[in-house]
Amino acid sequence: MDFNLNDEQELFVAGIRELMASENWEAYFAECDRDSVYPERFVKALADMGIDSLLIPEEHGGLEAGFVTVAAVWMELGRLGAPTYVLYQLPGGFNTFLREGTQEQIDKIMAFRGTGKQMWNSAITEPGAGSDVGSLKTTYTRKNGKVYLNGSKCFITSSAYTPYIVVMARDGASPDKPVYTEWFVDMSKAGIKVNKLEKLGLRMDSCCEITFDDVELDEKDMFGREGNGFNRVKEEFDHERFLVALTNYGTAMCTFEDAARYANQRVQFGEAIGRFQLIQEKFAHMAIKLNSMKNMLLEAAWKADNGTITSGDAAMCKYFCANAAFEVVDTAMQVLGGVGIAGNHRITRFWRDLRVDRVSGGSDEMQILTLGRAVLKQYR
């Protein structure tokens, strides 16, 4: 595997550096985090660069640049302080519809290309069904030529502002043998109620409870095939977990560099604290974690581009990077001392964000279970 960037990838990364240097984005991010607002202006700037077309096939007007390119872009964005967690649907959200959607559904989602606006997200988790997805109780019921959706979802990302969601529900006519199907739902429909939740971190992307009370749908609103809901979302889970891991790495790298600059400038006892062995030890351990994360992610990206990535690979990336990145940020905060906990330093935001990622997108525990099964399966 050669992870040297090619000319096209170098151009993308250079473009990211130029964009991030074009204005004081950190002030904008801090404002969006404080107000729990999606940074649409920033995402629009990325869309103008073609970032939302990186994985779209060329036949649909995309760049089909591959996951190594996505990894390079996400790593650089994160290193420079961008909240890449708001971009999870940007590289792959269009492709999901190109694979699974009807032409009408595809047209509705592709209309958001280049806008930077949030377009859709999945609604799977429920109050009684988190990691235990098989306990879903939201139902769809056919009656008089229509389909009616009833139930509730919780912790649904982006759902305060997305115009569409894809809802996983079980067939109300098959209580003994669950049939799970997804439905493409316009959020403006009658019977939908959204309650925005407050979060510890990841505040630039909304998280909501959604209730469905006899929401009327048509058969044409089915997303994918009936009964194929679980199979479809498995691929989405892997994609999301890889992107979460990329975000974790980039954020950790940003805090590492902030802390390194501080350690070389902060003087105590007559010299820079970076000359103290205890501080050097912290940076050695942070560097080991960062290097391990980077190599793991680039290998996974290469596997994705070559069709060999597995759910185990995605789980490994998600688990290791979520934990290692949080440890890096926590250590960097220790280096910064009072500046890191009492001021307005961005590390406080990063610390909150990364703690959430050990739960969201699949908990640490579920990643371990997925990875353990995948590892042992190779030796059966």
Curated annotation (Swiss-Prot):
It holds the Pfam family Acyl-CoA_dh_M. One of its GO terms (molecular function) is flavin adenine dinucleotide binding. It is found in: Cytoplasm. Coiled coil: none annotated. Pathway: Amine and polyamine metabolism; carnitine metabolism. InterPro entries: Acyl-CoA_DH_CS, Acyl-CoA_Oxase/DH_mid-dom, Acyl-CoA_Oxase/DH_mid-dom_sf, AcylCo_DH-like_C, AcylCo_DH/oxidase_C, AcylCoA_DH/ox_N, AcylCoA_DH/ox_N_sf, AcylCoA_DH/oxidase_NM_dom_sf. GO terms for biological process: carnitine metabolic process. Its EC number is 1.3.8.13. It comes from the Bacteria. Keywords: Cytoplasm, FAD, Flavoprotein, Oxidoreductase. CDD domains: ACAD. Homotetramer. This is Crotonobetainyl-CoA reductase. It comes from Salmonella typhi.
